[in-house]
């Protein structure tokens, strides 16, 4: 693996919205870079979108008056089967992950409500803590907290991992 910055590798292009697919199919993952004063029209999807803002601010809106402002570090799980759009005044770089209605979701996540992944899980002295956010037979999305000096032994798990550092610093490898 390699360390990289989603925001640095997906900088704004003036006046444009740019998308980069990093995983296709069910539970796709796409990076979006929206230049200042751009938008994506509201569309209806039969699945949730987990929106994780990396940089800037993003307004997630619907046609029924629904409107949520997200800043860097914040996330929202969109509702299904309702028109949802995105717009930004200052620009936004974010990750979008599709989550099927049938996928198991942690009850701490409420569709339509803004939250921070880092606030969902505590730190405890000398411990590693993990929490499932969403999963199905082919995908597992978790968050973990590591107290200073803790870690995991080298191990293998099926599939690949995309790791977001939400707080602090650590060593991978």
Model regions and ranges:
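A short, N-terminal "cap"/entry segment at the start of jelly-roll beta-barrel domains
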Residues: 1-28, 71-72, 91-93, 98-140
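Asparagine-centered strand-capping/turn motif at beta-strand->loop junctions
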Residues: 86-90
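Conserved short histidine dyad/triad with adjacent acidic residue
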Residues: 12-18, 25-45, 126-129, 140-157
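Residue-level marker of beta-strand positions
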Residues: 39, 74-75, 83, 151
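Short acidic-glycine-tyrosine-enriched beta hairpin
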Residues: 64-81
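Glycine- and acidic-residue-biased ligand/ion/polar-headgroup-sensing regions
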Residues: 47-63, 158-173
């Amino acid at each position: 693996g390699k360390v990289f910055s989603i925001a640095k590798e997906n900088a704004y292009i003036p006046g444009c919205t740019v998308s980069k697919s990093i995983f296709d199919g069910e539970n796709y993952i796409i990076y979006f870079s929206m230049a200042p004063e751009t938008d994506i029209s509201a569309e209806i999807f039969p699945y949730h979108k987990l929106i994780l803002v990396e940089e800037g601010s993003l307004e997630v809106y619907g046609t029924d008056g629904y409107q949520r402002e997200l800043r860097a570090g914040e996330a929202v799980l969109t509702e299904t089967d309702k028109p949802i759009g995105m717009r930004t005044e200052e620009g936004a770089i974010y990750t979008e992950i599709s989550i099927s209605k049938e996928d198991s979701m942690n009850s701490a996540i409420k569709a339509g409500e803004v939250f921070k992944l880092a606030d969902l899980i505590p730190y405890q002295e000398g411990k590693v803590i993990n929490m499932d956010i969403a999963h199905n037979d082919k995908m597992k999305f978790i968050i973990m907290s590591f107290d200073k000096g803790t870690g995991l032994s080298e191990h293998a798990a099926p599939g690949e991992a995309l790791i977001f550092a939400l707080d602090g610093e650590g060593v991978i490898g």
